[in-house]
């Protein structure tokens, strides 16, 4: 049973970073669980798209109500909301969310709205929602209530089902009306006051002024199979609600599972990070308990969008660049930052990315500290605001991946860890990078510590350059020692014995390479000019005078020669080889590093990225080798 509310509340997508202020969507629109609503409203840091869970064979009962009052600016003077799930079995006439053909209306308006803009004696657009307030307190067992309808609201009728105390967490009563006095069929009461009798007594006590309403919908979902992540969203005003958080996920867990806070072990009802305790299979050759991270990646969130400068018309002002992409449902802030990657080309702005409406903007971090080699360092910038998954070496992990919205495609990459895109198929190719389109979802199982079974901080991220700049990345923190604030996962009590300290096994063949990083002017197409005008003086850039490449030491002179167009460096090794790379930085400026993503490496020495709390510096300064 989930009692859900759709609320209008601020969302903090990113905290302040140095002098860069926090990124806050003041008009957040999200679903919350009844008992968590007050806490979420009080703290924008706790507001994000909802994640709830159900087990295989559960019948899920959802009661949805809304506090989103009519908004004359963005939604045609009338706010309605619903839930449309993508993968469950449900009655399409009553639990689809979408009102198709002769199906019932499965959406609702706000139960908090008691006034409406008036013009020439009439309300503007839709009338007041069917809301009322209790005139007198009631006791458990009472079958009658006295109410006063909102001014200009339509009146209830016999046979309708209404809710008393809808705003009270776990304290509401839904009842059928058997009698109304005075009879509204003979004319509405001038003072709006009515006495209502129900078919049965109420369960809870109710105070005077509590809200009485018809503005709610009850859905029922049948979870008959392990379908993993199920995407759902508002289907009434999606273009308005989605960019502000109006989406959610229900995770279908194995039969008999329980859901726990990783730090305390307590049972939880919602949230993107959870420990799932159980005994059933959840992927090929995997069963039992696992750590879970729900990664709802997205675009089309105006607050994390960034300005693109390369290839745009000379003299294009910030104001004009922002105005070129503004719309009623996509209101970008006037103080948005420029992208962290100056050679990013195409359009005047990015589209605003993140995970679970959280973004660790690289542009903000660069503004705070210009050393790009420290971009992902928690010791320099603090922890990212995106969800962090913590685990012990050998723990089972499942990434519940969703492209929640709305216009682009993405790639999901996990550093040092592999997964099968089809989790129950033993022949599904193990990879660490996955392309994902709009509304697609995957359930990706892996083992903490990855191919190398080593502790350390690893990255997960969106491989699109624009999304990475906006802050679509996070950390997987793997421990090999017991932590006070991280419970041990059932079935992996001996995790310390699984942790390796040495990467290559004794006797493994060694293959060595000497690689240099050099500056090289690049022309990506010898048959075209370096830039092509697309429209209105916007240019597609097909050359990079400030290019940087890798080359083998013995081939560096040829690669750097004028007129030579090198290919990206390819190194070949055999299965079972221990690969050693000496990297020399011959760039004029800036550190260099070498990150090989989908093979085993020591995350503390050879990841090539300074991630989280990992020690030392894994990059190479100009003129130095490592």
Name each region found by the language model.
Residues 1-129, 213-218, 313-397, 478-625:
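N-terminal, post-signal-peptide metal-ligating segments of extracellular/periplasmic oxidoreductases
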Residues 54, 154-158, 206, 231, ...:
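Short, well-ordered loop/turn sites that connect or cap secondary structure elements
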Residues 109-111, 137-139, 180-190, 211-214, ...:
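Short proline/glycine- and polar residue-rich coil/turn motifs
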Residues 222-226, 447-458, 465-467:
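Short, surface-exposed loop/turn segments at beta-strand-coil junctions that are enriched for proline
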Residues 246-286, 438, 468-510:
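Extracytoplasmic/periplasmic copper-protein system
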Residues 420-447, 459, 604-624:
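A cross-kingdom feature marking solvent-exposed beta-strand/loop segments within repeated
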């Amino acid at each position: 049973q989930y009692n859900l509310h759709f609320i209008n509340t601020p969302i903090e997508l990113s905290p302040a970073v140095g002098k860069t202020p926090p990124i806050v969507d003041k008009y957040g629109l999200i679903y919350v669980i009844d008992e968590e609503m007050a806490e979420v409203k009080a703290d924008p840091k706790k507001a994000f798209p909802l994640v709830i869970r159900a087990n295989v064979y559960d019948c899920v009962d959802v009661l949805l109500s809304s506090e989103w009052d009519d908004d004359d600016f963005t939604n045609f003077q009338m706010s309605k909301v619903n839930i449309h799930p993508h993968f469950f079995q449900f009655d399409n006439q009553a639990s689809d969310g979408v009102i198709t053909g002769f199906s019932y209306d499965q959406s609702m308006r706000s139960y908090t709205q008691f006034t409406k803009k008036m013009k020439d004696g009439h309300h503007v657009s839709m009338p007041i929602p069917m809301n009322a307030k209790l005139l007198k307190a009631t006791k458990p067992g009472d079958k009658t209530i006295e109410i006063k309808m909102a001014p200009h609201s339509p009146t209830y009728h016999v046979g309708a089902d209404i809710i008393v105390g809808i705003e009270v967490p776990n304290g509401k009563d839904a009842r059928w009306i058997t009698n109304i006095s005075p009879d509204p069929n003979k004319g509405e009461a001038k003072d709006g006051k009515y006495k209502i009798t129900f078919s049965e007594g109420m369960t809870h006590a109710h105070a005077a002024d509590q809200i009485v309403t018809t503005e709610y919908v009850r859905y029922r979902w049948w979870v008959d199979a392990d379908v993993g992540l199920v995407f759902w969203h508002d289907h009434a005003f999606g273009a308005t609600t989605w960019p502000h958080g109006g989406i959610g996920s229900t995770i279908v867990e194995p039969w008999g599972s329980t859901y726990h806070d990783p730090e305390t072990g307590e049972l939880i009802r919602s949230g993107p990070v959870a420990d799932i305790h159980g005994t059933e299979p959840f992927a090929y050759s995997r069963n039992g308990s696992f750590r879970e991270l729900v990664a709802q990646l997205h675009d089309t969130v105006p607050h994390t969008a960034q300005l693109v400068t390369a290839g745009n018309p000379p003299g294009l002002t910030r104001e004009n660049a922002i105005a070129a992409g503004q719309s009623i449902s996509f209101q970008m802030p006037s103080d948005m930052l420029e992208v962290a990657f100056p050679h990013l080309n195409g359009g005047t702005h990015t589209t605003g990315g993140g995970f679970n409406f959280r973004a660790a903007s690289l542009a903000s971090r660069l503004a705070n500290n210009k050393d790009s080699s420290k971009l992902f360092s928690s010791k320099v910038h603090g922890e990212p605001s995106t969800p962090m998954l913590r685990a012990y070496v050998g723990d089972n992990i499942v990434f519940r991946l969703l492209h929640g919205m709305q216009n682009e495609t993405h790639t999901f990459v996990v550093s040092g860890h592999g997964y099968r895109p089809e989790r129950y198929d033993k022949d599904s190719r193990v990879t660490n990078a996955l392309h994902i389109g709009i509304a697609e979802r995957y359930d990706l199982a892996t083992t903490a510590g990855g191919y190398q079974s080593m502790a350390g901080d690893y990255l997960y991220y969106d491989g699109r350059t624009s999304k990475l700049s906006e802050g679509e990345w996070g950390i997987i923190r793997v421990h090999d020692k017991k932590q006070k604030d991280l419970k041990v996962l059932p079935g992996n009590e001996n995790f310390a014995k699984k942790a390796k300290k040495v990467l290559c096994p004794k006797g493994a063949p060694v293959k060595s390479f000497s690689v240099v990083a050099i500056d090289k002017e690049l022309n990506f197409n010898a048959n075209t000019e370096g830039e092509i005008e697309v429209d209105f003086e916007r240019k597609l850039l097909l050359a990079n005078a400030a290019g940087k490449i890798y080359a083998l030491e013995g081939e560096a002179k040829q690669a750097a020669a004028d007129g030579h167009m090198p290919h990206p460096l390819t190194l070949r090794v055999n299965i079972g080889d221990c690969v050693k790379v000496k990297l020399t930085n011959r760039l004029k400026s800036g550190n260099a590093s070498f990150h090989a993503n989908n093979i085993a490496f020591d995350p503390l020495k050879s990841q090539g990225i300074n991630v989280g709390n990992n020690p030392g510096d894994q990059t190479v300064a100009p003129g130095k080798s490592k």
